[in-house]
């Protein structure tokens, strides 16, 4: 692994970010900014939910599962927003609001990476169901963001995509 082989350098960081097919980011500022400035696609496995990077049409993302400590159930999309954790970025904030973050499964991550690879190579076949789910997801996302009554909107035009397979397998989550 590049980061642990002892050959890491600032030049190689920039070179790899500029030349990669895509970058896998686990959230927060950091390396993914390098591929971003070179217009390379990013796969985001992201929290906080309200701060999904939506401005690059080549980006794909999923979010960690939000589990209620009280009911032990996975929260729906709108429940994440109504639980005051959509913009939280520290584990302490989630704990204070009674929410546990559950990492995405290896299958969920693999599905997202495969989708990105298929999109880049022109092999991805978007279905009518996928288009409908993307529209429903982003519409619900924008509605919930408006309810936060922020002084200034966090997102302009939404260009990114949420993981299609994740949406297909979690349709009840989008409400």
Where are these predicted regions, by residue range?
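Leloir-type glycosyltransferase catalytic cores
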Residues: 57-175
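Donor-binding and catalytic core of enzymes assembling or modifying cell-surface/extracellular glycoconjugates
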Residues: 1-68
């Amino acid at each position: 692994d590049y980061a642990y082989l002892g050959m890491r350098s600032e030049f190689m960081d920039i070179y790899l970010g500029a030349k990669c097919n895509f970058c896998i980011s686990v959230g927060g500022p950091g390396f993914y900014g390098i591929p971003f400035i070179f217009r390379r696609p990013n796969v985001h496995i992201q929290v906080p939910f309200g701060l999904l990077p939506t401005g690059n049409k080549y980006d794909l993302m999923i979010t960690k599962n939000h589990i209620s400590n009280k009911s032990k159930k996975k929260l729906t999309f709108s429940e994440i927003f109504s639980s005051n954790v959509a913009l939280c970025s520290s584990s302490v904030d989630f704990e204070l609001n009674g929410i546990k973050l559950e990492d995405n499964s290896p299958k969920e991550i693999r599905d997202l990476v495969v989708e990105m690879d298929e999109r880049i190579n022109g092999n991805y076949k978007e279905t009518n169901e996928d288009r409908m789910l993307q529209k429903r997801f982003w519409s619900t996302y924008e509605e919930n963001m408006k309810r936060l009554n922020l002084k200034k909107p966090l997102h302009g035009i939404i260009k990114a995509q949420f993981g299609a397979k994740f949406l297909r397998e979690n349709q009840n989550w989008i409400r």
